[in-house]
Structure formats: structure tokens, C-alpha cells
Amino acid sequence: MKHLTTMSELSTEEIKDLLQTAQELKSGKTDNQLTGKFAANLFFEPSTRTRFSFEVAEKKLGMNVLNLDGTSTSVQKGETLYDTIRTLESIGVDVCVIRHSEDEYYEELVSQVNIPILNAGDGCGQHPTQSLLDLMTIYEEFNTFKGLTVSIHGDIKHSRVARSNAEVLTRLGARVLFSGPSEWQDEENTFGTYVSMDEAVESSDVVMLLRIQNERHQSAVSQEGYLNKYGLTVERAERMKRHAIIMHPAPVNRGVEIDDSLVESEKSRIFKQMKNGVFIRMAVIQRALQTNVKRGEAAYVISH
């Protein structure tokens, strides 16, 4: 049984194994070792990509899937998250995927339950499977992380994606740049350097946009003029390196953090990220339940 709650708990070797397993699954290799097992997806925050991606991953592995949202569980009646997970464990659930608005909701939970917990996003904290699918997408493009410059733009302070990605990319040998409004800078995230949007775009191999996390701000945030000040405009995109790519964890607010015409442009890998998410989550579930597809020769060589 292996939980996955943060990227920092994964060694470089484990990351390599997950990426390689995901790539093999993407090529069609699977042995359905998990057929008949039960997965519960428990989401206390709205989700489209992560929720359905996990469900597709589970079904591709032959699992039975239980989907629950926070409003339909007894948590609404005062039940603790611990008791909810213990209930699922007692009725035969084998793995639980959780998205929660509370940072580090899993901190005590993982030592108290007997089924693996997979973190599908905790507040402003971490989003490990998003980070892994981003790594897979970047590696497919460049066959390395070492020496790359990856810039992350926008609401850094409230972004669990920025937090997960900055740490692991730095560990794998990439240089991380941040840009965005000064009030949204994250002083606790020391894995990147803040520069102007223009400087970051021109020097990056990967330009990663973030949406404004409106649900985590205490007051409404004006979107007027945001694109020209802090977003990826057509004019800025024209100054990107020839080989550089555009990424976004989605949901995308077209015309806010990225010009509408760039979302599905030649440089964009946004929908490829979503596709890769299914295979990464299949690999993560296999790891959680300690099963793996049979590997051939090592395909991923990660320098650090």
C-alpha cells in the first residue's frame, strides 16, 4: 500500500518508474491485475479533468468505481473525513482518491487508515498527479528535464500546481521562473525566481499558465486588463523560442491568462496534458496497490 499526497515523498527513481509505467500504459500494455477491485473518488471541490481522468483510469484498469461528492456524504451530517474513509475501507474499497479544500487534509489520515490515499488536490497545497502528467508531457517533448527553463505564470500564491511543479522540476535539474502580480507571489515557494512576464516568455522552453484562483481569494478579482499585463498574448507568444511549448493545468479561462487563439495553437500541449493524465493516474493507482505492468528496457533516464 502506497499513498501519494505530495511530490516530495517520491524519489527521483520512483518518478522515473511512474513515468515509464504511464508511457507503457499509453502504448497499450496492461494486464488487468486490478480487475474487480474498488476505487472511491471523493471530491469536496468541483472538478472536471481530475475527477473524470481518475474514473477513466480506474475503469481502464478494470476496477469498480464509486464516485462521491462532498454534498452526498455523511460529512454533511458532521462525520469526520477519517470515519468516512474507514467506512469505505470497511465495505471493501481498495483505494481512495480525495480532493479537499483544506490544505494537508491527509496529514494525520494516512497513518490512521489501511487503504492508500491518493491526493487529487488539497486547497493551495499540492496536486501530485497533475505534476506527474506535466512531467510526462515535458519529457515526451524534450527527453530530459536537466537544463530546461520552465516558467509558471499567474496566481502563484494560491496554486497547488505551481507548488508541486516548482519543487520537482528544480529537483530534476530544470530552472523555474515565476511571473505574475506582486500580491500573488508566494514567499514560501523558494524553488523559482520572479521575473517579468516578457523576460520569462522569451527565455523559457515551457510556458505554463495558471488561472486566477477566484475561489481562494477573499474578494472578487478584476480580470480587466489581466491578459495584457500578466497573460500570454499573441504578441508575447511570437517571442517564444521556436521549440518552446505552452502548457496549462486547466480549467482555462480563455482571454484572461491566455489568448483564446493560443489554447489550441501549434505550440499548445494543453489537451495532450489531459490525455497523459489518464495514464499517469493508472500508473499511480498501480503503484498504490503495488502492481505494475511488466517493463522492457528502461526508457526514462532522469539526470539530477
Swiss-Prot record:
Q: Which GO terms describe its molecular function?
A: amino acid binding; aspartate carbamoyltransferase activity
Provide the reaction this enzyme catalyses. Answer: carbamoyl phosphate + L-aspartate = N-carbamoyl-L-aspartate + phosphate + H(+)
Q: List the EC numbers from the record.
A: 2.1.3.2
Instruction: Report the family membership.
Output: Belongs to the aspartate/ornithine carbamoyltransferase superfamily. ATCase family.
Give the sites modified to Phosphoserine. S303
Q: Give the keywords, sorted.
A: Phosphoprotein, Pyrimidine biosynthesis, Transferase
A Gene Ontology biological process noted in the UniProt record is: 'de novo' UMP biosynthetic process
* InterPro entries linked to this entry: Asp/Orn_carbamoyltranf_P-bd, Asp/Orn_carbamoylTrfase, Asp/Orn_carbamoylTrfase_sf, Asp_carbamoyltransf, Asp_carbamoyltransf_Asp/Orn-bd
Q: Point out the gene that encodes the protein.
A: pyrB
Task: Please give the function described in this protein's UniProt entry.
Answer: Catalyzes the condensation of carbamoyl phosphate and aspartate to form carbamoyl aspartate and inorganic phosphate, the committed step in the de novo pyrimidine nucleotide biosynthesis pathway.
Residues engaged in binding L-aspartate: K77, R160, R211
For this protein, the record's Pfam families field holds: OTCace, OTCace_N
The annotated pathway is: Pyrimidine metabolism; UMP biosynthesis via de novo pathway; (S)-dihydroorotate from bicarbonate: step 2/3
Q: What is this protein called?
A: Aspartate carbamoyltransferase catalytic subunit
Chain residues that bind carbamoyl phosphate = R49, T50, R99, H127, Q130, A250, P251
Record text on subunit structure and interactions:
Heterododecamer (2C3:3R2) of six catalytic PyrB chains organized as two trimers (C3), and six regulatory PyrI chains organized as three dimers (R2).
